[in-house]
C-alpha cells in the first residue's frame, strides 16, 4: 500500500529525472528530459555533431611566407585561387602601393580611402608555395577615366577557359566608402598566358541589380568555376541601404555564361547563399561546395 510519504518520494524522483543536468558529453539521441528551445533545435533542425561529421570539416593554421615586403603604404589582400602551371604556382591579388596611408573620408585623387582604394591587380609566382617572387609591375592596371574601374580594381580571381586565362575583378568608378558605400561591379581581363600581357575589357560583365533588389549596390568578390560545361561566376551582393531599414546586409549569388566575356545571366534563385563575407566555391562530387 502506497503511503503519502512514498508518493512524495516517487514524485520527487520523477521531478529530478525530468530536470537532470545536461551532460558534458552530448548525447547522440535527443534527451527525453525537458531541454531549452536551443537544445531542441540542435536535435530537430541541426545535429549534435555540428560540422565535425561533415567530410569537408578541417582545421587550418597561418604560416609565414617569404617574398613580400611589409610597409604601411602597401596593402596586399584578396588572393585568387592559386594555380599550378608547368611546375610554377601563380597567384593574383589586390595590391595598393600609395604615397600615404588610407584616410577614410579625407581621401583625395592620390590618397586612398581604404586598403582596397587606388589598387591594381598584381601577380606573384613560386616554385614551392613558400617563397614568392612578385612581378615588378601590376598584371592589370587601372584604365584611364571613364573606363570601368578607373578609380580602383580589386578582389580578383582566375579562370582558365579553352587555353586562355581570364581575371575577373570588381571595379570602382568612385572613391570607395565616401558616397554610396563600396559600389562596384565585375569586369574582366584576358591573356594568352598566366604571365600576361593582360587585356582589360573595360566594361562591366556582371552588373548591379535594379533599385530595390538585393544586389543593387555591390557585385563583389567574383569567383568563377566551370560546372556542367558553363562558367558559373559566384559573387557577393548587397543592396543600396546595406542593412538599414531592415534590408539585407549581404548575400551570395551566381551568374552563368557560355563565354568568358558574357553575357552572364543571373540565376532566378539568387541569392543562393544568405551568409558569408567572401565567395569561395569549388566543384564537389556532382555539384558545388562552398566555404562561407
Task: Enumerate the predicted regions with their spans.
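Carbohydrate-active catalytic/glycan-binding domains of CAZyme proteins
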Residues: 21-292
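Bacterial Sec-dependent signal peptides at the C-terminal "C-region" and cleavage site
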Residues: 7-24
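Bacterial N-terminal signal peptides that target proteins for export
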Residues: 1-7
Amino acid at each position: 500500500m502506497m503511503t503519502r510519504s512514498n508518493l512524495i518520494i516517487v514524485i520527487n524522483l520523477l521531478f529530478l529525472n525530468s530536470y537532470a543536468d545536461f551532460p558534458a558529453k552530448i548525447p547522440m539521441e535527443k534527451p527525453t528530459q525537458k531541454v531549452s528551445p536551443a537544445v531542441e533545435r540542435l536535435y530537430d533542425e541541426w545535429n549534435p555533431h555540428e560540422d565535425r561529421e561533415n567530410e569537408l570539416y578541417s582545421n587550418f593554421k597561418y604560416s609565414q611566407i617569404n617574398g613580400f615586403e611589409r610597409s604601411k603604404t602597401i596593402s596586399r589582400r584578396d588572393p585568387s585561387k592559386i594555380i599550378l602551371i608547368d611546375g610554377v604556382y601563380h597567384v593574383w591579388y589586390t595590391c595598393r602601393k600609395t604615397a600615404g596611408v588610407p584616410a577614410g573620408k579625407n581621401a583625395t585623387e592620390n590618397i586612398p580611402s581604404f586598403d582596397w582604394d587606388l589598387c591594381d591587380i598584381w601577380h606573384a609566382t613560386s616554385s614551392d608555395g613558400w617563397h614568392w617572387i612578385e612581378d615588378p609591375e601590376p598584371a592589370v592596371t587601372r584604365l584611364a577615366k571613364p573606363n570601368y574601374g578607373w578609380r580602383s580594381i580589386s578582389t580578383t580571381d582566375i579562370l582558365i577557359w579553352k587555353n586562355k586565362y581570364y581575371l575577373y575583378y570588381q571595379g570602382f568608378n568612385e572613391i570607395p566608402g565616401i558616397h554610396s558605400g563600396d559600389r562596384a561591379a565585375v569586369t574582366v581581363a584576358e591573356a594568352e598566358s598566366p604571365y600576361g600581357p593582360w587585356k582589360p575589357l573595360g566594361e562591366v560583365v556582371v552588373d548591379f541589380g535594379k533599385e530595390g533588389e538585393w544586389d543593387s549596390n555591390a557585385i563583389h568578390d567574383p569567383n568563377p568555376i566551370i560546372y556542367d560545361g558553363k562558367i558559373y561566376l559566384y559573387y557577393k551582393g548587397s543592396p543600396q541601404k546595406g542593412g538599414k531599414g531592415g534590408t539585407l546586409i549581404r548575400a551570395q549569388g551566381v551568374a552563368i555564361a557560355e563565354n568568358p566575356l558574357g553575357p552572364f545571366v543571373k540565376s532566378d534563385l539568387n541569392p543562393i547563399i544568405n551568409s558569408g563575407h567572401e565567395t569561395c566555391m569549388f566543384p564537389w562530387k556532382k555539384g558545388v561546395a562552398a566555404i562561407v
